[in-house]
Amino acid sequence: MTNIRKSHPLIKIINHSFIDLPTPSNISAWWNFGSLLGVCLILQILTGLFLAMHYTSDTMTAFSSVTHICRDVNYGWIIRYMHANGASMFFICLYMHVGRGMYYGSYTFSETWNIGIMLLFAVMATAFMGYVLPWGQMSFWGATVITNLLSAIPYIGTNLVEWIWGGFSVDKATLTRFFAFHFILPFIISALAAVHLLFLHETGSNNPSGITSDSDKIPFHPYYTTKDILGLLALILTLMLLVLFLPDMLGDPDNYIPANPLNTPPHIKPEWYFLFAYAILRSIPNKLGGVLALVLSILILAMIPTLHTSKQRGMMFRPLSQCLFWLLVADLLTLTWIGGQPVEHPFITIGQLASVLYFSTLLILMPISGIIENRLLKW
């Protein structure tokens, strides 16, 4: 008799995805982030569900309902902080995952890569709308500033913004629809993640060497299930340290002030994980130009497979490209720092230089380094 996990129609899918999946024998801890992202998504859906049971999406009561969750609901404070800091952990894992894909040339799996970019946009949209829900000062002004960027679109911009707002300003209609979208998007993300995995399992995983590993595969379970548990424990430890000791470290103090349309905060800024894109937006004095740069800062990922000029897949044996990759990482950290600073000298200049470096590294320097490395191979 055949084992049930190999014969049952439903369990068979799980078996082929997580148990008997042929996996390269040499993948490192950088391949752990995919499973960690899955854990983050499940955690966010569960904590979000419990928060939604007590939250009210009305401008009059939203702020006090979040306060009520923290003060009166049984363990409401820990659920709220796990959800807020869970989003930060989600983005840390997400950026590491994308960075690993860029370093080891995983973008050559074009379908998997493109669905990954769609996932990134969906997660960013979800996080942005979630930040609006507590209806604090930064929630309100963040929503106003970011949605208002759409007015830069010629002809239809103003109508589009008013359509998204559901009125002539960010108000009750905006909050209600943002809550509805924030609730539904994680389920769309789950479906996209399933398609992401489907395409990945069509080709099999990449590995650090960048060479095909068909001749050297091992089953996912028990080898990588146990390896992933280590990463999972590290993730949970970091998250719980944040939640229990520094719950507000990554948040903005202004969001503890109820939203007031008549009082603008001194520095409007998004959550830390959007600061690099916000810095790129601010570095261009023109509104439409800034919006285009903002979108391109993420959409440029879709161009990476086209810009790949090297004969080697990953950067494992390409020191010049490695230097540029870590320059890009340092540049993104600089942009993140600049995004949180006020718009004044010298931060404006640093932001503009970092933005130019970001685009020139990806569009010009990396393709050139690939060509140079190809030439060096012939010597």
Swiss-Prot record:
Heme b b562 binds at residues 83, 182. GO terms for cellular component: mitochondrial inner membrane; respiratory chain complex III. A ubiquinone binds at residue 201. GO terms for biological process: mitochondrial electron transport, ubiquinol to cytochrome c. Keywords: Electron transport, Heme, Iron, Membrane, Metal-binding, Mitochondrion, Mitochondrion inner membrane, Respiratory chain, Transmembrane, Transmembrane helix, Transport, Ubiquinone. Gene3D superfamilies: Cytochrome Bc1 Complex, Chain C. PANTHER family: CYTOCHROME B. The cytochrome bc1 complex contains 11 subunits: 3 respiratory subunits (MT-CYB, CYC1 and UQCRFS1), 2 core proteins (UQCRC1 and UQCRC2) and 6 low-molecular weight proteins (UQCRH/QCR6, UQCRB/QCR7, UQCRQ/QCR8, UQCR10/QCR9, UQCR11/QCR10 and a cleavage product of UQCRFS1). This cytochrome bc1 complex then forms a dimer. Belongs to the cytochrome b family. This is Cytochrome b. The gene is MT-CYB.
